[in-house]
Amino acid sequence: MFLKHLTIQNFRNHEELSLDFDSRLIFFVGDNGEGKTNLLEAICILSWLKSFRESEDSNLIRWGSENYFLRGKIKNNLKESVLEIGFTSKPSVKRKLKFNQEEIKKRTDLIGKFITVLLTPMDLKIIEGGPAERRKFIDAFISSFDPFYLEFLLEYNKILKHRNALLKSGNLDISHLSIWDKKIVEKGIFILNKRREVVLELNSFYRVNLDKLSGGKDGLELIYKPNVKDQDEFLEKLNRNLSRDLRLGYTSVGIHRDDLFIGTDQRDITEFGSQGQKRSTVIALKAATFNYYKDILNTIPVLLIDDVIRELDVKRREYFVDLVVTAGQAFFTTTDLEGIQDYVGKLKDQKQIFLIRQGKVEPIK
């Protein structure tokens, strides 16, 4: 996949931008606070339909404006398409999505249209943030290519909310609750099986990547640890824990309690990992998602790399350059104009550089 053009209006600190991309490596260069990461964020929203930094769309609107607008022209193989996202802070209309000028009502209809892999310093949260962050990571990854998974996940969360409301109310009708139990198990088992299948594949890529990054020193694994193993156990645990759940006011068992173990010999990386090991794990994990798209789904995503490479030592930087060579297109943010040559590798003639200064974005020849 290639992003050929990006239009931005009233997004973050950028009033209006129209950028054409005709190279494989795109660098956004500027001092901290100039808005480099805002450009990657705009590209991410075209891909994920949400920001990786901000949960509220209204906070993405440029100060003094009422809306923002993003347009991307995407090339996949020989086919070009246009993806547009508009958001207004007015009460009447919130977000509007268009694909090739046709309005899109369901976000699942845009899954797979523009796939990106983002690497940012914030990714350390996957390692350090515990089970919730790791579930969020695996759910976001699978949802990026499987619309059924996303629909089941959204349904599961709705059912969970209803069940929790029933538990909190104290007015418990067992026959009513059993209806929700059957629904939550049905949705949950689909999610469980998909997570299990995908994590198994990801682990094979992750281990190879980590061996390259650590020279074989870090024998870590990804292991999916479900809270329930199958449909029968899920139902049995819901029934067995009913008294406890009534006391707590929420559902204490289910796939919303799963974990993605990252470590070795039953010890999670958070217990022993150095910052270097954690950084290697994040890179190996994100690279594994790239491998999955490429080798399992036959899609080469766009790489988005936010000010990460300057923190890497020589060995990790060399690995990253090799990864970039296999990608179709990669976008980087950096403060170091002089250091760009260190990580373009064999692609030094296939780069574009944009200088970001005081809200303006200018190409450097």
From Swiss-Prot:
GO biological process: DNA replication; DNA synthesis involved in DNA repair; double-strand break repair; SOS response
Domain of life the protein comes from: Bacteria
Pfam families according to UniProt: SMC_N
GO molecular function: ATP binding; single-stranded DNA binding
GO cellular component terms, semicolon-separated: cytoplasm
Residues holding ATP: 30-37
Compartments (UniProt record): Cytoplasm
InterPro entries assigned to the protein according to its UniProt record, in alphabetical order: DNA-binding_RecF, DNA-binding_RecF_CS, P-loop_NTPase, RecF/RecN/SMC_N, RecF_2
Keywords on record: ATP-binding, Cytoplasm, DNA damage, DNA repair, DNA replication, DNA-binding, Nucleotide-binding, SOS response
Family matches, as SUPFAM superfamilies: P-loop containing nucleoside triphosphate hydrolases (SSF52540)
Assigned protein family: Belongs to the RecF family.
NCBIfam families: recf
Job description of the protein: The RecF protein is involved in DNA metabolism; it is required for DNA replication and normal SOS inducibility. RecF binds preferentially to single-stranded, linear DNA. It also seems to bind ATP.
Name of the protein: DNA replication and repair protein RecF
Annotated gene: recF
